Amino acid sequence: MHKWILTWILPTLLYRSCFHIICLVGTISLACNDMTPEQMATNVNCSSPERHTRSYDYMEGGDIRVRRLFCRTQWYLRIDKRGKVKGTQEMKNNYNIMEIRTVAVGIVAIKGVESEFYLAMNKEGKLYAKKECNEDCNFKELILENHYNTYASAKWTHNGGEMFVALNQKGIPVRGKKTKKEQKTAHFLPMAIT
C-alpha cells in the first residue's frame, strides 16, 4: 500500500515543482522585459544614486560627478576664481563644488565648477590650479575601507612614494612630499550637492 501511494505522489510532486519553476522564470522574464544584463545588474545593485557613486563603476571611464570634497580635517577643498587652492569651512561656497571627471580606470581630473580651474600637482608636490587640463591634473582615486577617498598624483612620486592631495588642520594644502595614504589630511569624502 505504501508503494502504491508513493508512485502516485512522486509524479504529482515533480509536475508541481516543474510548474512552479516555469511560473517563477516566466514572472522574472516578464519583470525584466527587454533589459540587458548590465541594466539588470544596475537595477539590482544600485537602489539609489548615492549608492552608485560609492561603487567602483565610475572608475571605468567617462563618468562625471559633481561633489564637494570634504577633508577629514573638517575643511572643504576649494579653488577660487584666481586659481588659489585652499580649504574653506563654508559648506555653501560655490568655489568648493568640484567636477570629478574619470579620464582612465582609477584616474580622475578634478575641476572647480565655479572657477573653471583644474586641480594640479607639480613635481615638488605643491597643489596649484590650471585652466587647461594636462598630466599634472591627473590623480589616482582610491576608496579606502573607512569610506574616504584619497587622490594621489598620477604623474609624480617622491622617493618612490605617492604624493597625495591633503589639507592640514588650518585648511592649508600640504605638500605631497609630506603626505601618506594613512594620514587623515589626505582623506576626502565626496559629498553630494544638496
Swiss-Prot record:
What molecular function does GO assign, one term? growth factor activity
Q: Does the keyword Secreted apply?
A: yes
Q: Can you quote a single GO CC term?
A: GABA-ergic synapse
Any Gene Ontology biological process? positive regulation of cell division
- What subcellular compartments does it reside in? Secreted
Tell me yes or no: is Secreted among this UniProt entry's keywords: yes
Similarity section = Belongs to the heparin-binding growth factors family.
Task: State what this protein does.
Answer: Plays an important role in the regulation of embryonic development, cell proliferation and cell differentiation. Required for normal branching morphogenesis. Growth factor active on keratinocytes. Possible major paracrine effector of normal epithelial cell proliferation.
Subunit info here reads: Interacts with FGFBP1. Interacts with FGFR2. Affinity between fibroblast growth factors (FGFs) and their receptors is increased by heparan sulfate glycosaminoglycans that function as coreceptors.
Name the chain's protein: Fibroblast growth factor 7
Gene source species: Homo sapiens (Human)
